[in-house]
C-alpha cells in the first residue's frame, strides 16, 4: 500500500504518473477486499468505481466542485482519496459510515442513502451556485446501480434539461446491469463532437440559417434533424438523454483512466449539463465477486477474503422465513403475485421468482409505482404482495393511502428491516412505518414476534381482500419461538401474573410489539424479582387496536407499551387513544425509539443507548410503580 498511504487528499493524485495511478488502483482494490471482508459492507459496487473515482478527483476540484453520490454505497474509494483510510471499524459505532457523511469530511455533500435523489440535489446546488455568482463551479452527480429506474431521477433530469447554462456533470455508472452498452469508434467520435462548444455553435448557426431559407429551409432542417436523430438512436444509447436536451458523452470504458479523464475534462469545460456514460464492472478485480451471478457481492457480511465465503454460517433469518412461506402460498393460490422494487434477493423473493417466474414483477427502484401497480393487480382480482425495506415504504405513502386504501383493495405490504437495523445508519432504520401507517383508514398492521408468527400472519394478511395489510419484521436472525400461554381477544398472552396476585389487580400490563417480545419477557422476570407482577401480551395485529385491550388494561395499575418504532404516533400512542376512548383511566407509558436520526452502530448498541433493553425497561417500570401514583392501595 505504498502509494495509497501517501494520499491524504485529492490533490495528491495530481503528482502521480499513469503507471503509478494504475498501481494505486490495484492497491485500492486490494485494500477494499482486505478491509471490507473483516467488517462487511458494499464491496462489489466500490470495486467497480476505482478508476472512475480516481479520474473524477483528478479532473474536478473537490470540495470546491461538489461531487455527489446517489445512494452513496459506492463512496468507499472517495473516502480513501479524501483522507479517510481507517476502515477498521467501517459501519461500526465510532467508525466510518458506510455512506457519505458530512460529519466526516467537507468532501461529503449529502448523506441520504435512499436512491434516485442525487440529480435533484445537483439541480438545486447548481441553481444556487448561479444565484450566488459561482457559475464556474461544476456539480458532479454519480448515479448508477439501477437508480435511474427511479422516477425522481427523471423528474430531476427534466428540470436540469430546462437549464442549459448549469454546469452539471451527470456520471452514469453503468455496471452492465441497467443498460446494454454500445461501444464503437463512431459512437465515441460523435460523443466527442457533441460535447464541444464549437459543435454546439455550428449546430445553432446551421439551424437558424436553414429555417430562414424560404420554402425548403424548414423542410430540409426537419429532414436532417430526423436523420441525425435516427442515426444517433441506432448507433448509441444517448437518444433517451439527448431527447431531453441533455448532451451525452460515451459510452466510456469506466476502467480506462485516460479515457475517463478526457471525458470528464470535456464535460467540465462544456458549461452546461452533460451525461457521461461510464461502463464499469461490478466486483472488478476480485474473483469471488466476478463469479457471483446473484449480485457481484453488492453487500457482504464478514467473509474469507480468499474465497468470499462467509466466516460463519448464520441461522435462519426473518427474510428467508418470509421467502419460504411465499413459495408455499404460491403453490396454494394461483392468484398470489409478488412485487419487488429492485430488491429481489434482499427481500427474499428470489425463491418465489424461481418457482413462479410469471407471477413476480421487479419494477426497479420505484416504490410508488410498485404500490399503484399492486392496486391495479388487486383491482383485477389478484392478491399482490409488495416486499420492500420498511424505510423505503415512506416513499410510497401517498399511493398506499390514496390508491390502495381508498379503493379498499387487498394488497399486502411486507416490510423487511423494520425497526432498528443498525449499521447502515439513520436512513435505513425502519422506525417510521408504524407511525405513518396509523393514519391510513382500514389498513391492518401485523408485527410478528417469531418465525411461526411470520408464517401465520402472512397467511392471515393475504386472506384480506377488502383492505391493505402490512406485515413487518426485523433484520437478521430470527430468534427462538416465543410461545403463548393463552389468548385474550385476538391477542396472545405471553406471561400471566404470579399466582399470589391472582385475586387483585396486577401491577403492570406490558404490551409487546413484534420482535421486542423476548426483551419484554426478560423485563417481566426482572420485575418479578422485585415483587412487581406483570402480564405480557402480544397484540399480533397492532392496527387496529384489539377490542379486548382496554378491558385488560383496566385490570392493571400501569400499562407499558414497548415497540421497535418511533414513539411519536406509534402503537403506544394508538393504544393510549383507545384507552381514552374506552374511558379506561389507567396510566400508560410508551417505550420506543426517540424521534432522532440515529448514528450507525450495531442493533444491540443502539437499543442499549436508547433504553430499549430489558434491564433499562424494568428499571423505569420499577421507578414508576414505586411512586405514590401507582402504589398498591
Curated annotation (Swiss-Prot):
Question: Looking at the keywords, is Transferase present?
Answer: yes
Q: Which Pfam families match?
A: DXP_synthase_N, Transket_pyr, Transketolase_C
Pathway in which the depicted protein is active: Metabolic intermediate biosynthesis; 1-deoxy-D-xylulose 5-phosphate biosynthesis; 1-deoxy-D-xylulose 5-phosphate from D-glyceraldehyde 3-phosphate and pyruvate: step 1/1
The family database entries (SUPFAM superfamilies) matched by this protein are listed as:
Thiamin diphosphate-binding fold (THDP-binding), TK C-terminal domain-like
Q: How is the cofactor bound?
A: Binds 1 Mg(2+) ion per subunit.
Keywords (alphabetical) are:
Isoprene biosynthesis, Magnesium, Metal-binding, Thiamine biosynthesis, Thiamine pyrophosphate, Transferase
**Binding, thiamine diphosphate:** 73, 113-115, 146-147, 175, 286, 367
GO biological process terms on file: 1-deoxy-D-xylulose 5-phosphate biosynthetic process; isopentenyl diphosphate biosynthetic process, methylerythritol 4-phosphate pathway; terpenoid biosynthetic process; thiamine biosynthetic process
The reactions it catalyses are: D-glyceraldehyde 3-phosphate + pyruvate + H(+) = 1-deoxy-D-xylulose 5-phosphate + CO2
Query: What EC number is given for this enzyme?
Result: 2.2.1.7
A GO CC annotation recorded here is: cytosol
The cofactor(s) it depends on are: Mg(2+); thiamine diphosphate
Q: Name one GO molecular function term.
A: magnesium ion binding
Enzyme class, top EC level, equals transferase
Job description of the protein: Catalyzes the acyloin condensation reaction between C atoms 2 and 3 of pyruvate and glyceraldehyde 3-phosphate to yield 1-deoxy-D-xylulose-5-phosphate (DXP).
Q: Which family does it belong to?
A: Belongs to the transketolase family. DXPS subfamily.
User: What does the record note on quaternary structure?
Assistant: Homodimer.
Q: What is this protein called?
A: 1-deoxy-D-xylulose-5-phosphate synthase 2
The organism's lineage is:
Bacteria, Bacillati, Actinomycetota, Actinomycetes, Kitasatosporales
